[in-house]
């Protein structure tokens, strides 16, 4: 059942000068829901009222209101996520980017990314979105092992993701990412090695690898609770991470964030904005935005989202304004995950003392005036942050 949420009025927003500005666009559509996924996505059976075209109209209305509120700043990155953006098809994705251009100033060197599922892409799709101005594609590979794909409820064939990446490259994309998941119950070391090798051999310049997390309320969580599947083991997850890192490093990829590796120049600029103090407007059902010291989030259900925008009102469900302590905590939490490291100047005297203990434990190294996670430190990044912050 959908309950109408009263929209909340956002305070005035003042983008910080000199910081990159991005736009995130959330596509809430999926043909089926993967068992591990807790993202804000909906299948056709769950929606009924909101077609892709009605959603596009609502999104256009939000972008118009956003541009008016912000005085149309220059956009350096655009990221279309989901859900399954590729379900829209190439023409609708082209329209989506035109909508951003209609309401904002798109920088000449803007990075424009879209997520895609391998089973809903084909060469003409990639040709269409490349011609429209997209510069980067991120494909959900997860694994090449049939048993792993089955456990994750993925519907593409084992070789389809790598083939899709090859098609994207052939149609002119120089920046292509493949997402992997490691630690799935039933996965072997060999399954993971073959998956990493397949990603490298596809010719991509970026690989993301995430440990499987059993999210509350998902089909996977119910299977684990019933004893049908074992929960991921922390020691196994650490070993698998090391396998990924070693395999990618040997292939010429370098880590630049704990879960992300790339060839030189292949970093995802939009995601770097999230981790390194950037600002963005999040448009679409359930999307989050962050500008100045204000973070906000939209209503989640696409029907409610469209209804509110039909009244020319921003569909904001809530917001918070971060004080100095919260901003500092986020700064440490995010920057410590980056290869460029955490500037010592950002730490207070007590935090520097605690950092010495972490350095002595071999979890951090000095790189000039910055603290950078060691290989072992990356496995314990959350614990490092907790120690630094006390």
UniProtKB/Swiss-Prot annotation:
It is found in: Cytoplasm. [4Fe-4S] cluster binds at residues 30, 34, 37. GO terms for molecular function: 4 iron, 4 sulfur cluster binding; coproporphyrinogen oxidase activity; metal ion binding. Gene3D superfamilies: Aldolase class I. GO terms for cellular component: cytoplasm. The keyword Chaperone applies. One of its GO terms (biological process) is porphyrin-containing compound biosynthetic process. Keywords: 4Fe-4S, Chaperone, Cytoplasm, Heme, Iron, Iron-sulfur, Metal-binding, S-adenosyl-L-methionine. S-adenosyl-L-methionine 2 binds at residues 83-84, 142, 154, 179. Its cofactor is [4Fe-4S] cluster. Residues 15-254 form the Radical SAM core domain. It comes from the Bacteria. S-adenosyl-L-methionine 1 binds at residues 24, 82, 115. Transmembrane segments: none annotated. Belongs to the anaerobic coproporphyrinogen-III oxidase family. HemW subfamily. Probably acts as a heme chaperone, transferring heme to an unknown acceptor. Binds one molecule of heme per monomer, possibly covalently. Binds 1 [4Fe-4S] cluster. The cluster is coordinated with 3 cysteines and an exchangeable S-adenosyl-L-methionine. Was identified as a high-confidence drug target. Might carry two S-adenosyl-L-methionine binding sites with only one binding to the iron-sulfur cluster. This is Heme chaperone HemW. It comes from Mycobacterium tuberculosis (strain ATCC 25618 / H37Rv).
